[in-house]
Regions:
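Outer-membrane beta-barrel proteins
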Residues: 17, 21-22, 58-60, 83-89, ...
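Solvent-exposed loop/turn segments connecting transmembrane beta-strands
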Residues: 39-47, 68-78, 88, 102-113, ...
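Outer-membrane beta-barrel "beta-signal"
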Residues: 30, 34-38, 141-153
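Residues on the lipid-exposed face of transmembrane beta-strands in outer-membrane beta-barrel proteins
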Residues: 32, 52-56, 80-84, 118-122, ...
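Transmembrane beta-strand segments that form the barrel wall of outer-membrane beta-barrel proteins
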Residues: 30-38, 62-71, 93-106, 120, ...
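Short glycine/proline- and aromatic-enriched beta-strand/turn motifs that initiate or cap beta-hairpins
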Residues: 20-68
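Outer-envelope beta-barrel architecture signal
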Residues: 24-28, 60-62, 76, 90-94, ...
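Cleavable N-terminal export/targeting peptides
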Residues: 1-25
Length: 153
């Protein structure tokens, strides 16, 4: 993992926390698992993306997240992102996760790259789920992704 990845990740987390923190909005979640369903199912992707991460909600619309998982092409991916979800409908939040990740050899030879992921989140009192869509792009086959989360604070 490159130093640049961690510098960008820490700066993003600090800036997001300072810019949008609101009283009584702080929650800590542990994100586990991960499943994907690829639009192109003929490529024999791994769709059981085991992993673990943390997500810290700094406001009703914003959280920061970091973690690691076994990706669809059977490499380990590490990520750090700011999750901005300005659209709220009860316990459902909609928006985008913006961050850095690695572990995909077809993109910058497996190095660190910027990613944006449309994200819908449901959060109950103790359990939640993140639902994302990875769009089809040049070297990326799109997929639906699911990540489960447990509130610890």
């Amino acid at each position: 993992m490159s130093i640049r990845f961690w510098v960008v990740a820490v700066l993003a987390l600090c800036c997001a926390s300072a810019a949008v923190a609101e009283p009584n909005a702080h929650e800590l979640w542990v994100n586990v698992g991960g499943f994907s369903s690829h639009f192109n199912s003929s490529k024999n992707y791994n769709e059981n993306n085991a992993g673990i991460g943390v997500e810290y909600r700094v406001s009703p619309q914003t959280s920061v997240m970091a973690g690691s998982y076994y990706n669809s092409i059977r490499h380990t991916t590490t990520y750090a992102a700011v999750n901005w979800q300005p659209y709220l409908l009860g316990n459902v939040k909609m928006g985008v996760a913006l961050g850095m990740m690695d572990g995909y050899p077809s993109i910058v030879r497996g190095g660190t790259f910027f990613a944006a992921l449309p994200l819908v989140t449901y959060e109950g009192k103790k359990l939640g789920v993140n639902l994302g869509i990875i769009p089809d792009m040049a070297k990326v086959n799109g997929a639906f992704v699911v990540q489960f989360k447990f509130r610890v604070y």
